[in-house]
From Swiss-Prot:
PANTHER family noted in UniProt: CHROMOSOME TRANSMISSION FIDELITY PROTEIN 8 HOMOLOG, CTF8, CHROMOSOME TRANSMISSION FIDELITY FACTOR 8 HOMOLOG (S. CEREVISIAE)
GO molecular function ontology, one term from the record: DNA binding
TM spans (from-to): none
UniProt feature coiled coil, ranges: none
Keyword Nucleus: yes
Subcellular location: Nucleus
Highest rank taxon of the organism: Eukaryota
Protein name, per record: Chromosome transmission fidelity protein 8 homolog
InterPro entries for the chain: Ctf8
Amino acid sequence: MVQIVISSAGAGGLAEWVLMELQGEIEARHSTGLAGNLLGDLHYTTEGIPVLIVGHHILYGKIIHLEKPFAVLVKHTPGEQDCDELGCESGTRYLVTALIKNKILFKTRPKPIITNVPKKV
């Protein structure tokens, strides 16, 4: 039988993340990829509607509550140093760092923000 040890972060409570769902594809300008880079600005209107601004485009979305929340896990495999201090009988552990209970769905096409483009003279 396989046992997976999962523990939570403690009494401080877990962070709550939000999942963002976009239609289509997002490409980076450079070949470095999107990891670790700023995607855009997320704002909320006074009515609570999420607004995502990416470059010169704006997207309007809606918040959807997930029926089954997701847990964000961090895998911790004990190294030789951990084995000496704590003993190696426990094996791999997973730590719950955050919960995802809501997602923001952007299902419409992005609208351009720039309205007037200067013409060449």
